[in-house]
């Protein structure tokens, strides 16, 4: 039997070994690594809210009034007025009757999907969906059918060819694909879900707060807010806090309360997180939030244009997630290492997160990045790309 040491050695040999980097200080556009300041270009803190004064003040007030922990799971004694207030705010924001908060995006997807689908049901999932969606589908024991990325014609054929005698059909997709930065074809998915009497679930972890005129996400941007059956999103990316949610009809939310194991068997989110999340929604839904979205969009356009002008492949990105194609794992990690030496912190993405041969730098932009920040990053990426023969 292969030992742990042997497996770890093999990962190192293949350039696939992973380790954690200590980031000192707060999650702003610049961070301190190994005692020196670097430009942070790999955080999901898209609007810069993780260090926003309004969120910090809300969290402090909540701790002073409610304490640090929630004490129990939601179905025991762990439901506070802060939970109910946040869920009401999320439902209003997403235009649904009800909402439910979970402890993480992973817990939300595994809990929702394994509750909604089971034996006798069929789950149709985009090939590039997040790992938590895949794990939720596997946990459900439903039939799991994956279709090629954004290929609506193949999905239609699979829906036609897959018999479901008495069970549910669930179509589930990322709204924004986390490693490529492109968008799901939500209008076409809505048409299919209607035609085949399926449920549609959208994981909008990377769209909520960022996309759409009101920051309500990819479904708002595509004009299908009311047509999505289950809106899933996270509180720890553009919203700057922690946790996740499902927004749906009262019937579906009641069902999740009774069937979603990751919800039932977890101590509930603490007061500080709930209050900060509530403040984040208020900010996103204000003129200040609109200004942040405009700044992020402008930064995205400038950054992509700068990279594309010198020959980098940004892999069809349509959002603030900008992949820079490199190819091999070893070369990608060398690229990341050299960038850090130049004061730019960008993580290399390798298998199993992305398919072999498609390794890339995953650059993520923030509304708070300045033009000088972006120019610094473009200059460093260009110089190292030329050195390594990527461009």
From Swiss-Prot:
GO terms for molecular function: 8-amino-7-oxononanoate synthase activity; pyridoxal phosphate binding. InterPro entries: Aminotrans_II_pyridoxalP_BS, Aminotransferase_I/II_large, AON_synthase_class-II, AONS_Archaea/Proteobacteria, AONS_Proteobacteria, PyrdxlP-dep_Trfase, PyrdxlP-dep_Trfase_major, PyrdxlP-dep_Trfase_small. It catalyses: 6-carboxyhexanoyl-[ACP] + L-alanine + H(+) = (8S)-8-amino-7-oxononanoate + holo-[ACP] + CO2. SUPFAM superfamilies: PLP-dependent transferases. The keyword Transferase applies. One of its GO terms (biological process) is biotin biosynthetic process. Substrate binds at residues 18, 130, 353. The keyword Cell division does not apply. Keywords: Biotin biosynthesis, Pyridoxal phosphate, Transferase. Pyridoxal 5'-phosphate binds at residues 105-106, 178, 206, 234. Its cofactor is pyridoxal 5'-phosphate. Its EC number is 2.3.1.47. It comes from the Bacteria. Belongs to the class-II pyridoxal-phosphate-dependent aminotransferase family. BioF subfamily. Catalyzes the decarboxylative condensation of pimeloyl-[acyl-carrier protein] and L-alanine to produce 8-amino-7-oxononanoate (AON), [acyl-carrier protein], and carbon dioxide. Homodimer. This is 8-amino-7-oxononanoate synthase.
């Amino acid at each position: 039997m292969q030992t742990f040491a042997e497996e770890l050695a093999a990962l190192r040999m293949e350039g696939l070994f992973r380790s954690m980097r200590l980031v000192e200080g707060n999650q702003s556009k610049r961070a301190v690594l190994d005692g020196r300041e670097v430009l942070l270009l790999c955080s999901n803190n898209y609007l810069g809210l993780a260090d926003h004064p309004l969120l910090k003040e809300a969290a402090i007030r909540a701790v002073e009034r409610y304490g640090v922990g929630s004490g129990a799971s939601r179905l025991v004694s762990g439901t506070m007025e802060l939970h109910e207030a946040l869920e009401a705010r999320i439902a209003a924001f997403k235009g649904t009757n009800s909402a439910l908060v979970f402890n993480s995006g992973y817990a939300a997807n595994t809990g929702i999907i394994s509750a909604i689908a089971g034996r006798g049901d069929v789950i149709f999932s985009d090939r590039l969906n997040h790992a938590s969606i895949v794990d939720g589908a596997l946990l459900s024991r439903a039939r799991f059918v994956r279709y090629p990325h954004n290929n609506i014609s193949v999905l239609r054929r699979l829906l036609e060819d897959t018999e479901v005698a008495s069970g549910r059909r669930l179509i589930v997709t990322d709204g924004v694909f986390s490693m490529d930065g492109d968008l799901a074809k939500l209008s076409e998915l809505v048409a299919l879900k209607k035609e085949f009497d399926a449920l549609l679930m959208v994981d909008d972890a990377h769209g909520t707060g960022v996309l759409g005129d009101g920051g309500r996400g990819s479904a708002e941007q595509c004009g299908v807010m009311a047509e999505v059956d289950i809106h899933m999103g996270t509180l720890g990316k553009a919203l700057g806090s922690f946790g996740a949610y499902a927004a749906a009809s009262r019937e579906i939310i009641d069902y999740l309360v009774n069937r979603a194991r990751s919800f039932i068997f977890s101590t509930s989110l603490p007061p500080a997180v709930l209050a900060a999340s509530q403040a984040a929604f208020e900010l996103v839904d204000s003129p200040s939030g609109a200004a942040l979205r405009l700044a992020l969009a402008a930064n995205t356009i400038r950054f992509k244009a700068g990279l594309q002008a010198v020959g980098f492949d940004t892999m069809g990105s349509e959002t603030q997630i900008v992949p820079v194609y490199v190819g091999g794992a070893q070369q990608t990690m060398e690229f990341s290492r050299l960038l850090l030496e130049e004061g730019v912190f960008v993580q290399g993405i390798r298998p199993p997160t992305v398919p072999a041969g498609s390794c890339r730098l995953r650059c993520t932009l923030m509304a708070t990045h300045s033009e000088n920040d972006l120019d610094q990053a473009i200059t460093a990426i260009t110089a190292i790309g030329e050195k390594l023969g990527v461009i």
